[in-house]
């Protein structure tokens, strides 16, 4: 799996430039954006959502039940009573 570092090396730019292009931030010339996008495509780079959430101090609940099903719930996606149900599910599967 390609990393941000791999994309930066291939495009000949810094990791912060790659990040700015991926996050569609200002301050990057169009020619540089094209080089980075080409490198992303060549490497098959896919941003890591978990890492992004950690950086943004966002969190989620991930639970695997007895059948192997995985439940992923992003913070703020549930009401208080629903959180209680998720906690109960966790307790049942410990």
From Swiss-Prot:
Family matches, as PROSITE patterns: HTH_LACI_1, HTH_LACI_2
Record-linked InterPro entries: HTH_LacI, Lambda_DNA-bd_dom_sf, YtfJ_HI0045
DNA-binding region residue numbers: 4-23
Coiled coil: none
Occurrences of domain HTH lacI-type (ranges): 1-56
Keywords in alphabetical order: DNA-binding, Repressor, Transcription, Transcription regulation
A single GO molecular function term of this UniProt record: transcription cis-regulatory region binding
Job of this protein: Repressor for the scr operon. Binds D-fructose as an inducer.
Entries under PANTHER family matching the protein: HTH-TYPE TRANSCRIPTIONAL REGULATOR TRER, LACI-RELATED TRANSCRIPTIONAL REPRESSOR
Record protein name field: Sucrose operon repressor
Organism of provenance: Vibrio alginolyticus
């Amino acid at each position: 799996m390609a990393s941000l570092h791999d994309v930066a090396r291939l495009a000949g730019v810094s990791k912060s430039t790659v990040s700015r292009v991926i996050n569609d931030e200002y301050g990057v010339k169009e020619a540089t954006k094209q080089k980075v996008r080409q490198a992303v495509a060549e490497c098959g780079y896919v941003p890591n959502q978990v890492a992004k959430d950690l950086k943004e101090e966002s969190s989620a609940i991930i639970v695997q039940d007895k059948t192997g099903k995985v439940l992923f719930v992003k913070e703020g996606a549930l009401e208080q009573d629903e959180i209680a149900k998720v906690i109960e599910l966790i307790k049942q599967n410990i």
